[in-house]
């Protein structure tokens, strides 16, 4: 679930966001975001009816159910408290779409 922290608790500021959608092919790992040293925030939302596994790293670094599992209607965010700047990949056992955004 996305947990918005108060502005007073974070100095994480960003000026622009890119809103994207990634189509995942069944059982095929895919890169979702490139590594980005300017990243300040990212969110991933599973609007599908099947599980999606997020992989913090290259596609070969994870597998179905070996990463951050997003249940249907689930979400995960990268923020000032867990700022990860590397690649983000994903995989699902079924064809689906992953909605995501990245802010710099």
Per-range role (PLM):
Residues 1-20, 94-104:
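Short, intrinsically disordered N-terminal pre-domain segments
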Residues 18-37:
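Surface-exposed ligand/attachment interfaces on beta-rich extracellular proteins
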Residues 34, 71-85:
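Beta-sandwich interaction modules
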Residues 37-39, 46-51, 93-94:
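Short proline/glycine-enriched turn/loop motifs at strand-loop junctions of beta-rich domains
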Residues 40-42, 80-96:
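Noncatalytic modules at the cell exterior or secretory-pathway interfaces
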Residues 44, 52-54, 70, 88-90, ...:
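Hydrophobic beta-strand residues in large extracellular and virion-surface proteins
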Residues 45-66:
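Short, surface-exposed beta-strand/strand-loop-strand elements in extracellular ectodomains
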């Amino acid at each position: 679930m996305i947990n918005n922290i108060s502005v007073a608790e974070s100095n994480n500021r960003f000026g622009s966001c890119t809103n994207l959608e990634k189509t995942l092919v069944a059982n095929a790992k895919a890169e979702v975001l490139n590594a980005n040293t300017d990243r300040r925030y990212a969110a991933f939302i599973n609007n599908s009816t099947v599980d999606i596994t997020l992989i913090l790293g290259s596609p070969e670094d994870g597998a179905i159910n070996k990463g951050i599992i997003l249940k249907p209607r689930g979400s995960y965010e990268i923020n000032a408290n867990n700022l990860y700047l590397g690649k983000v990949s994903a995989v699902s056992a079924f064809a689906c779409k992953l909605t995501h955004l990245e802010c710099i």
